[in-house]
């Protein structure tokens, strides 16, 4: 399955909520009707969505938020299920610990897609070592930094400025002047927030 490269707003409308695929700081709510499906008049249906359909939609939504494809998502779920504790929370913590997501959370990219591109283009280091795998799992204490050659990129400077205005998550510590941040700890479920019902995904894979 190829990665979706079409209009990002369409995905948010399909899920009925802003997935922040365009920007973490600018909501789509004022630009398009998130409560109507894609299409000129929005798709309507009188049929009630089945439990399976609801669970599937939730999985699709989370996959789109984090930019993860099906096979990789299944691997994340399998790992989350093997770990102790709540499987749904484990899943979200694994996704939040991805390098591209941490780069995004630190404000170096305005979207996860942009953060993923920074990693793929070798603009990021982890503990001083160049990293180019977006799915790399970041561990507590790891230091993420922008490479010297990329520090003058306007998109990084703008994204970081907007992130500073909006506030950073409590589980990262960012030094904007040095273009680096520390992954303090794996976030707790309450720290992740978002319009996500991970229990629906657990129910889906438990069928």
From Swiss-Prot:
Residues 97-160 form the S4 RNA-binding domain. GO terms for cellular component: small ribosomal subunit. Residues 31-55 are annotated as: Disordered. It comes from Burkholderia multivorans (strain ATCC 17616 / 249). It comes from the Bacteria. Residues 42-53 have a biased composition (Polar residues). Keywords: Ribonucleoprotein, Ribosomal protein, RNA-binding, rRNA-binding. One of the primary rRNA binding proteins, it binds directly to 16S rRNA where it nucleates assembly of the body of the 30S subunit. This is Small ribosomal subunit protein uS4. SUPFAM superfamilies: Alpha-L RNA-binding motif. GO terms for molecular function: rRNA binding; structural constituent of ribosome. Belongs to the universal ribosomal protein uS4 family. One of its GO terms (biological process) is translation. It holds the Pfam family Ribosomal_S4. Coiled coil: none annotated. The gene is rpsD. Part of the 30S ribosomal subunit. Contacts protein S5. The interaction surface between S4 and S5 is involved in control of translational fidelity. Gene3D superfamilies: Ribosomal Protein S4 Delta 41, Chain A, domain 1, RNA-binding S4 domain.
